[in-house]
Every structure is written in C-alpha cells, then in structure tokens.
A protein has these predicted regions:
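Non-catalytic structural scaffold of enzyme domains
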Residues: 1-274
Length: 274
C-alpha cells in the first residue's frame, strides 16, 4: 500500500456546535494517530430550523475553509448537513467527504426491524434516514420524531435539567407506543443525552449512534487511499468556531475532560479573528 505525504494532514470534522464532539471522540478512539481540525458553526446554530438552501450555503463555506486548512478528509458531523448537502457538495471538492446517514442506516437495519429515528426538523423533513433504511432493508419499518428543543438544551448545558427529561419523555412517547426495537440518534448532539434516553426507553431498545459507524467508514476510506497516518508523535486537535469561543470551550469541557483552546474564525474572509 502506498502512503502519501498527505497522510500527515488532519481530518476535518464539522458540526453546528458541540454535537460533533461525539464524532470527534470516535476519531480519537478509532484513529488515535490522526490530527483533527474541528469546526463548530456556533454563530448559526441550530441547523435544524434552517432551510435547505441555507444549509448547503453553510456547508460550502465550511468546506472551502477546511480546504485552506489542508484537511485530507472531511466528516460532516451533522446529520442535517449530511441529509441536505452531502450529495450536492461532494462533486465540487477534491477530497473525500463523509456523512452520517448511510452508515447510521446500515447499522440500524442490523439491529432491528422497527426502527425509530429522532432528529432535527430539517433531517426528519428530508426523509433521508427513511430512504436509506428502507433501501438497506425493505422490510424495515421506520418511525420518525423531530426533536427541535434538544440541540438548544444541550448547547446551553442543560442536560441534567428536569425540563430536559420531560421534553425527552414527550418526544419519545410515540416511539415507545409503536414498539420500536431500535433507536437511531439522528443528530450528533443526541448521544450526549444517552443517559436520559435510557431512563425512558424499554431495556430491549438498541441505541444506534451513527458517529461510531461514520468513523469506521472513514478509517476504511483512509486505508484504501493510503492516507491513514501511521506517524509517531502526538496527534493534535485544533478547535475553531464561528461564534463565541469561550462559550464553546465551557460547554465542551464536559465531554473533552479539559478546557480546550478555541479560536474564532471568519468563514467569509478565511482569516482568524482575535
């Protein structure tokens, strides 16, 4: 296998906010030698209420910026972007771009036949998971619920708020009533709520976190392209946001185990701001 010089370049991971940290954690676990450029579009979250045209525009801007950072691969750590923009933007960039929908759908059909999907309003409306699941297994039944309050609650660090538990009960009730056996966490923010979801769901329901499966796919792609980093030395992770870097750092500390250094970036000028 030929290993290219670009193998030392970082992987780009992007989301609207801290949700993509669930993908970042999987990169650190499955690909510990890889450096990462993480971007959170916090100035424009939540994406779930945005129009498809807005989402596509944002993704183009982020990917152009990531090209300037010399990433060797981009992972859309955002189901809304994956559902609405992936197929459109792929043709315009000369680097592999991976999304969450297909890996998540394929994992779900391997777990059960009555599959629930919780996601943002935009992802649910796109029906991307319904199509991907039914293409993978025409016998599967899919039940979707949009959960618009989850992302703002997580970004506000209100996971342990009693209100969040009540909201989760309300969202999951129809899925429990139809007897799902599998639940796809169709937004990268939602694994942060796994503890709460487990309280509400029957014990036999399997949770599917697409983050682990998209990183598995990324690992296979890097192998095929000879771009996997086998470099000795410590891999780095650099954090960038479009909004308030201090706020992102404080919220993300819960999952990173430390306070990250976060820089603010202007997507329009591709220049770092102080």
């Amino acid at each position: 296998m030929v290993v290219h010089q670009e193998a030392r370049f970082p992987i780009g991971v992007f989301d609207s906010g801290v949700g993509g940290l669930t993908v970042l954690q999987e990169v650190h676990r499955q690909l510990p030698n890889e450096s990462v450029v993480y971007f959170g579009d916090t100035a424009r979250l939540p994406y779930g209420k945005r129009s498809p045209a807005e989402i596509i525009e944002y993704v183009y801007e982020i990917l152009h910026w990531m090209q300037s950072e010399r990433v060797k691969m981009a992972i859309m750590a955002c189901n809304t972007s994956s559902a609405l923009a992936l197929d459109i933007v792929r043709k315009d960039f000369d680097l592999p771009i991976l999304g969450l929908i297909l890996p998540g759908a394929r994992a779900a059909v391997g777990k059960g036949k009555r599959i629930g999907v919780i996601a943002t309003t935009a992802t649910v409306r796109s029906e991307a998971y319904v199509r991907a699941i039914c293409e993978s297994d025409p016998q599967a039944q899919v039940f979707q619920v949009d959960c618009p309050e989850f992302v703002p609650l997580i970004e506000s660090d209100r996971i342990n708020d009693p209100y969040t538990l009540q909201v989760a009960r309300d969202y999951l009730r129809p899925l429990v009533e139809v007897g799902i056996d599998t639940l796809v966490l169709g937004c990268t923010h939602y694994p942060h709520l796994s503890g709460i979801l487990r309280i509400i769901l029957p014990g036999h329901v399997t949770l599917v976190n697409p983050a682990s499966y998209v990183v598995k796919a990324a690992s296979q792609e890097l192998d095929l392209m000879g771009l996997k980093c086998s470099c000795s030395g410590k891999a780095s992770t650099n954090f960038f946001v479009s909004g308030d870097p201090d706020r992102f750092a404080q919220v993300s500390r819960r999952w990173l185990g430390k306070l990250p250094v976060v820089q603010k970036v202007s997507l329009s000028s591709l220049e770092l701001l102080s």
